[in-house]
Amino acid sequence: MRKITTSAYMPTEIEVENVSENVAKIIAYPFETGYAVTLAHPLRRLLYTSTVGYAPTAVKIDGVSHEFDSMRGMLEDVAIFIINLKGIRFKIKGDSKREVIEYNFTGPKEITGKDLNNDIVEIVNPDAYLATINEDADLKFSVVIEKGIGYVPSESIRDYVSSDYIALDAFFTPVIRAIYDIENVFVEDNPDYEKIIFTITTDGQVSAVDAFKNALEAMYQQMSVFKGIVDIDTGKSFTKQIPSGEHSKLFESIENLNLSARSFNCLEKADIKFVGEIVIMDESELKGIKNLGKKSLEEIKSVMEEIGYPIGNEEIKDKKEVLSKKIAELKKKAKDDK
């Protein structure tokens, strides 16, 4: 029998099983009815869209002008060669996000992924087939390898690659397959709780467990915007909610500074409504506020020091453009809502 509660049951168990080198099962339970699919579905989507991987984004082949061309001495035409190339999974060994790799093969030879290994890249599927060339062929080509997420069409890549390169559709995700099953599980003789069983397969660029961790982090980052919601009251009959983030104090009304009436009124008349607007000003700009005397200036400087944002704060100055834009948006929204 299900008991009446005022909060959802918190899952307490997680199991990780490495089925093979690139396959893992991740099991978590127990969840309230309906919670399992609510969490599992977006995680599955994020596994595909947010896991960082590597892919060939452009190729230049000596003697070839376009993807529908053919090459003497190569069994495959260029279109098939490109399809095979996109099926080879590269991994840059260093920290670089982009590398241009040059290859030169003389026939007769059957070229596979292992032949593309070098000091710069590792091929995680070395048995993948690329092309076959005969004794008359001399195959020279350059491949651009980039680091990214998700899928980027060739039209977007064509905008920035050299005209002598053929732009490729780039499939960055290293996650080959991500599925989940939901099963019922008992909690105190109640079978209505749920278990999530993820089965994740990658191409070897990253482990399945690391891919899952990455998806969790991506979900947390995306959802965190809703975590920091605060009220803003400017004293002008509007209250808005905005994400607070790392520097929530910056988006509070200047009323919260508890300044003297004279100091507050000077700022108010200068259309300064948020703490962040003061932070991004230097002392000379503050002095330029109409009717703001020396005593008020010292009061404002003292209060800003107390809340941890001294005038001329270098950390915030580096974010001035972003902060100014966000505050401008808040002001506009407040004005529109009047």
Swiss-Prot record:
Positions of the UniProt region annotated as Alpha C-terminal domain (alpha-CTD)? 246-338
Key words, A-Z: DNA-directed RNA polymerase, Nucleotidyltransferase, Transcription, Transferase
Catalyzed reactions per annotation: RNA(n) + a ribonucleoside 5'-triphosphate = RNA(n+1) + diphosphate
Classify the source by domain of life.
Answer: Bacteria
One GO molecular-function annotation for this sequence? DNA binding
One Gene Ontology cellular component = cytoplasm
Any GO BP: DNA-templated transcription
One Pfam family name is: RNA_pol_L
| Residues covered by region (Alpha N-terminal domain (alpha-NTD)) | 1-230
Q: What InterPro entries does UniProt report for this protein, alphabetically?
A: DNA-dir_RNA_pol_insert (IPR011262), DNA-dir_RNA_pol_RpoA/D/Rpb3 (IPR011263), DNA-dir_RpoA (IPR011773), RBP11-like (IPR036603), RNAP_asu_C (IPR011260), RNApol_insert_sf (IPR036643)
Q: Where is the signal peptide?
A: none
Q: What is its EC number?
A: 2.7.7.6
Q: What is known of its domains?
A: The N-terminal domain is essential for RNAP assembly and basal transcription, whereas the C-terminal domain is involved in interaction with transcriptional regulators and with upstream promoter elements.
The record's note on quaternary structure and interaction partners says: Homodimer. The RNAP catalytic core consists of 2 alpha, 1 beta, 1 beta' and 1 omega subunit. When a sigma factor is associated with the core the holoenzyme is formed, which can initiate transcription.
Function comment: DNA-dependent RNA polymerase catalyzes the transcription of DNA into RNA using the four ribonucleoside triphosphates as substrates.
Q: Which family does it belong to?
A: Belongs to the RNA polymerase alpha chain family.
HAMAP family for this protein: RNApol_bact_RpoA (MF_00059)
UniProt-recorded name of the protein: DNA-directed RNA polymerase subunit alpha
